Amino acid sequence: MAISRRQFLTMVGIGAAGAPALLRNGYAASRDRVTIYHSSVADSINPYNHSSSPIYGDWQHIMEPLIELDYAKKDYVGVLAESWQFQGNKWLFKLKKNIKFHNGAPLTSKDVAFSIEKMRDEKGGSLQAPNFKDVTEVQTPDDQTVIFVTKQPLAIFLDRLENRFILSKVAGDKFGDKLYDNPIGTGPYKFVSYQRGGNMVFTRNDEYWGGKAAIKEVIFRKVTEDAARLAALESGQADFINNVPDHEVARLQKHPRVRIDKVEGLRMFFLAFNMAFKPWDNKLVRQAANYSVDAPAIIKNIFDGIGYPINGPVGANVIGADPALKRYPYDPQKAKQLLAQAGFPNGCDIQLYYSAGRYPKDKEVCQVVAAQMVKGGFNVELISQEWALFWDKQGVNGGKLPFYYIGRGSLTDADTLYDQYFRTGTTKRTNYSNPELDKIVEEQQKTPDQKKRIALLRRAGKMIMEEATFIPLYNLADIYGLARNLIWKMRPDEKVLGWDMKIK
């Protein structure tokens, strides 16, 4: 899509006459404000009604988790938690002292228990409930201690706690159902406003317990069109954008205002089957689909070779990856043979769903996938849906999309994928059910010995590939464009954090 300067100015709500005021400081980010144009910004004011890494980054400006993964250390570090212990079917956490919410109330264990209760409230719109399905009780013996009691030893519980943000119970008791209209957390920024559709504004918390951020105001604007984000960056309307198209990198590197940063991403892209729909309940058809898709060719032809094909059910850097496993080779003739065996000698009609603009070149990817699958004997109808609708149908309680293109962000442990997509009853994303696989996944979840747990994950991965439960594709490089005078800390998890930024 080509977009003119005048078209862009119209899109952002000003006429051409307003351009000079807009652009007069366009070649340098403000020292007080950073404006971020992002393809994925929260679609709901409820911070628990999401399950997406970049959106977690939005909310983390104002509220914080107990722990988070340090990607450099490849281990968990405390945020609100000072320490933690694994005690059989219990996890005991000690909270840091002298932390206050934005309303002045001190952080206590009661706030943690209150927030977990909100996260488990599926009827209230939370998508976080599956993370606590194995928790039977949350105990608060004193203000600084939280104990999670689980059905059985749960060695992987720390992974479940990442991105689980804590809100103020005092605010919850005061505002009730209106709590999310002005969420109160402990984070480095305070909530200012939210506009439905994906515009958020945060202002600095000058009394933040972890030290004052350099940037005073952070603005997120949801812009799904690549061309619109690029125009905003080049004009100075935006200081930072995500999902820079790879074919634009060389040109933008010559731009006087723009710098390009790249990092290997943790988001794994794949095509998911929903076994509640025919023909995906047929293993032969799923295998045929795997033989029909050429991921390396997609990386080469669409992403200019900037990508990392996945050769098993998870990428090589994920805990539990098995280098012995290989992806299905591209073999359209083999696909046709399998379809004939499955009862489709004249081809098979399918629908492929995606959300245009959510991921880099997602429309082009799905068009190429459809063309590849036609050669394998499939007749593919492409259907694009706005992200909120797509997510509602695909997400935790969805189960309404038969076949879809999706990216799983911040995938560091194979358990996350196996549990959320292939364990019976965890979610409705694929409606796959295999008691033998369930047993292996559940066994590794309670195995504290990491070597033994990885061996179990590899057994599960082998079964997943044999059953052709989905089509693993690739990891991509996350490509960002930003003002040259903006310094930030790059992360592989797609979070864009204002307190990691400063102006030079």
Predicted region positions:
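Detector for C-terminal structural segments
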Residues: 8, 15, 195, 261, ...
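N-terminal lobe/hinge region of extracytoplasmic solute-binding protein
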Residues: 37-89, 117, 184-185
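A structural "hinge/loop" feature
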Residues: 40-56, 79-80, 105, 127-128, ...
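Ligand-site clamp/hinge motif
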Residues: 92, 205-251, 379
